[in-house]
């Protein structure tokens, strides 16, 4: 297996330069995983009630969780159209599921991940028309021991808290098992389907 890690800033110019570099190297993308997300930031936390919604905070959450992944995928679209059997995954979250929302709250985070899922669905429809061997995955990594989950880990049982290496192995395992069927899969780290 050969892994090529690429980094870029999230500007359109930076992403375009990365895509051009990969295109000129005739890179065949087998897996493209967009791994970014934010739940809280400077001066804001996940909303527990409608009255806590702050437009600036919500815009930041949507920028990171929804718009940035799509900006990456938009820049990489030419590669995805020409690569043999590319698997495209973006980190979603179970809390972005309408069918699995039993608690409410976390308005910005939940809705940003639900919006990401819809955009990934649109991408799956677009890609299948030009590259039927492509697959798109909205991936819920579980609760991973990262700065994003730190403030909320007290509510997570120790056996349910994944370490980064476990999360990476689970992602690899799930992506190794997906089938290019022209649809978007919404799955968790165990490979189980999440309801929309």
Spans of model-derived segments:
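A conserved hydrophobic alpha-helix of the Rossmann-fold in NAD(P)-dependent oxidoreductases
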Residues: 12-19, 149
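Catalytic loop of short-chain dehydrogenase/reductase
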Residues: 38-42, 46-70, 81-130
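Active-site-adjacent helical/loop segments in soluble small-molecule enzymes
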Residues: 142
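Rossmann-fold cofactor-recognition segment
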Residues: 2-15
């Amino acid at each position: 297996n050969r892994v090529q890690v690429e980094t870029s800033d999230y500007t359109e110019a930076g992403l375009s330069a990365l895509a051009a570099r990969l295109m000129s190297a005739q890179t065949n993308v087998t897996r493209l995983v967009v791994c970014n997300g934010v739940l809280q930031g400077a001066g804001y936390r996940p909303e527990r009630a409608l009255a806590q919604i702050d437009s600036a905070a919500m815009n930041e959450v949507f920028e990171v969780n929804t718009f940035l992944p799509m900006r990456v995928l938009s820049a990489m679209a030419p590669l995805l159209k020409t690569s043999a059997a590319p698997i495209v995954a973006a980190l979603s979250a179970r809390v972005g599921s309408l069918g699995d929302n039993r608690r409410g709250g976390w308005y910005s985070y939940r809705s940003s991940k639900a919006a990401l899922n819809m955009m990934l669905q649109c991408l799956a429809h677009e890609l299948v028309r030009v590259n039927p061997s492509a697959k798109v995955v909205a991936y819920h990594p579980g609760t991973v021991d990262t700065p994003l989950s730190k403030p909320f880990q007290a509510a997570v049982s120790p056996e349910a808290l994944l370490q980064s290496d476990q999360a990476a192995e689970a992602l690899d395992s799930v992506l190794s098992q997906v089938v290019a069927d022209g649809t978007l899969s919404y799955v968790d780290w165990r490979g189980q389907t999440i309801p929309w």
